[in-house]
Amino acid sequence: MNNWKHNHVLDLSTFSLEDYKTVLELTTRFKDVHKSSSKKLPALHGRLIANLFFEPSTRTRTSFELAAKRLSADVQNFSVSSSSLSKGETPLDTILTYISMGADILVIRHESTNVPAELANYVDINNINTSILNAGDGFHSHPSQGLLDLFTLATFFNPNEPSTNSLLNKKITIVGDILHSRVARSNLWALTACGAEVTLCGPPSLLPEEFIDFVQNPRLGQNFDPINKRGSVFIKRSLKDALKNSDAVMTLRLQKERMKQNMLKDLDSYYAQYGITHESLKWCEKKVPVLHPGPVNRGVEISNRLVEDNSINLISKQVENGIPTRMALLYLLGLNKKD
């Protein structure tokens, strides 16, 4: 793992193809540990990992906690409801308290974009030996989700040896609230870097023309590797057109808490036009897996029947793979810590 250069994990835009390979290889190894009878390794024994979630979370926070414990780390979970924030303390002062307590890794989720990046900058400027791991900031980035989705798809396409090449030339369609989705952005970086062709689909209000600026980022898609032309991104408005010849489909939750008024006509109309169902999947012209990062709104972005059809959806696999993926990230960051 000597090629790992990151002191923080903030955004997958900074990842090289070698970084993705490293994470996938480690995740494969840690998945075996996670499934073993002992379930634990002493890799991060004595390290302190603090989970600071300033935004509600169930799956991600629990997944990070289990991942840290599987590596034998000491874990502290921050709760907004029982914190000094209610007494007027700022989030920065709360975070600095954990740094003063000797936290080796801070796992941070915040509703505002770039909070983890600003904290990482503060840590670096002040030469503090603490790593920052972004667990989701606004609708900017969610790197661990992008990586676990990458691993889930790589494992589906190549169960015996999941790798970055498992995604090469695969057609992945992402449907839904792209505008407000940090998951979509992280998946775009990961999937295109590994050579996938990604199609985005959603109503104009949730996939506006301005998003094309993100898609045309000079480091995204085929521009990431101009020699091998790895990856590409397309935008389509018609669900039927978007699903045609897809190898996998990811549907996203409508983030109503982030939406402005009148961004959607109504939920029934949205479901009729963009809902993923057994019937709409026929447009793929073959049996394909369906992913959803959760939480799921049944009957809005995905049918109730499809949520319960484990022969098609990989939702439980995504949750399962979240633990070894986050073990890999914590392990890599923990390796850089000085005693």
UniProtKB/Swiss-Prot annotation:
Residue stretches in coiled coil: none
Q: Which Pfam families match?
A: OTCace, OTCace_N
What keywords does the record list, in alphabetical order?
Pyrimidine biosynthesis, Transferase
- Read off the SUPFAM superfamilies from this record: Aspartate/ornithine carbamoyltransferase
Biological process annotations from GO: 'de novo' pyrimidine nucleobase biosynthetic process; 'de novo' UMP biosynthetic process; amino acid metabolic process
Q: Which reaction does it catalyse?
A: carbamoyl phosphate + L-aspartate = N-carbamoyl-L-aspartate + phosphate + H(+)
Q: Where does L-aspartate bind?
A: K87, R182, R253
Pathway assigned to this chain's UniProt record: Pyrimidine metabolism; UMP biosynthesis via de novo pathway; (S)-dihydroorotate from bicarbonate: step 2/3
Report the GO molecular function annotations: amino acid binding; aspartate carbamoyltransferase activity
Q: Provide the top EC class.
A: transferase
Task: Please state the Enzyme Commission number of this protein.
Answer: 2.1.3.2
Q: PROSITE patterns annotated for this entry?
A: CARBAMOYLTRANSFERASE
Q: So where does carbamoyl phosphate get bound?
A: R59, T60, R109, H142, Q145, G294, P295
One GO location term (cellular component): cytosol
- NCBIfam families assigned: asp_carb_tr, PRK00856.1
Instruction: Please state which protein family the record places this protein in.
Output: Belongs to the aspartate/ornithine carbamoyltransferase superfamily. ATCase family.
Report the function annotation for this chain: Catalyzes the condensation of carbamoyl phosphate and aspartate to form carbamoyl aspartate and inorganic phosphate, the committed step in the de novo pyrimidine nucleotide biosynthesis pathway.
PANTHER family the UniProt entry points to:
ASPARTATE CARBAMOYLTRANSFERASE, ORNITHINE CARBAMOYLTRANSFERASE, MITOCHONDRIAL
Q: How does it assemble?
A: Heterododecamer (2C3:3R2) of six catalytic PyrB chains organized as two trimers (C3), and six regulatory PyrI chains organized as three dimers (R2).
Protein name per the record? Aspartate carbamoyltransferase catalytic subunit
Q: Which organism is it from?
A: Prochlorococcus marinus (strain NATL1A)
Q: What is the lineage of its organism?
A: Bacteria, Bacillati, Cyanobacteriota, Cyanophyceae, Synechococcales
